Amino acid sequence: KTGEPFRSLMSELEHSAMLASWMSANMPTMRSLLVDTSIFYEGGISETQDLAFSISIALEYMRAMTQNGLSLEKALKQISFKIPIGTNVFHTIAKLRALRIMWARIVENCGAPANLNPALLDASISKRVLSGRDVSVNMLRASCACFSAVAGGADTVTLFPHTQIVSAPSSSDRRIIRNIQNVLKHESFIANVADPAGGSFYVENLTDIFAQKSWEIFQLIESKGGFSKQLLAGSIYEMVEKAWKVRKNNLDTRRDSVTGVSSFPDLYENLEKIEAVVEKKLKSQNKTGLGFNDLALD
């Protein structure tokens, strides 16, 4: 979270490329490299920044693999994406659709057909949108995230039990979170439609806006040497830190409201366990004070 790698970043990329080459030769149906921007998203970055980071990291992987002797077609088959999502339904739908558009453009600019290898997306609900207070509301958040992920074209969806922020989930908690997906699949039939949001002017327009703004951030990162160089230089950390300050202020001033925390809180809820979790978090992050966001975020 400080932007400092545990080991040489270039060495890690080289080893990742070697692993991908071995996987391509010995287990061609498996994907070895996962683009996961969860740590940045939980740090407070916006949807467009998250898209730009994802594409930039994927391009770093692709360059490392091709430089290691892997063909472009085989390199593309080694990459998959884990995209953190929130509870804003339309933003999530547009975000996932925009990522596919941007990735297709990257593939095409690299000299391959745009439809050679569509992005494989795992949409995972971010812990930053889960609340430690009134945890039952997390079931609604998970439902929104799951619906929007499927409507946005995710290949797989990852959800967390609603109690995970404050305690170890019980078997009942895990069953509830599984059934959210089952209900959406078997009762709404949303999975039977290829592109549920296709044709909606609002969604199409929002997708274009996300793609355009994300592409501009991506181009800025690339113009300065790529994601790895910017990470080592501290620029990525600065972007995350700036985004976090904006998000924290919006949460603390209720510009961004959190149901059950800053809006409609349960004033009679037993907060002892929650306060213990928050205190542990504050100590680990060297923070002082207790804002609405500290109760809302993991």
Language model feature labels by segment:
Residues 50-122, 127-129, 136-137:
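Gly/Pro-rich turn-and-neighbor structural signature
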Residues 36-42, 75-86, 118-128, 160-167, ...:
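A glycine-rich phosphate-binding loop feature that marks nucleotide/adenosyl-phosphate handling sites
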Residues 2-21, 135-138, 217-231:
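Phosphate/diphosphate-binding loops
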Residues 46-51, 86-98, 126-140, 167-177, ...:
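Short glycine/threonine-rich loop-to-helix capping motif typified by GTGT followed
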Residues 175-298:
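Catalytic-core signal marking the mid-to-C-terminal active-site face
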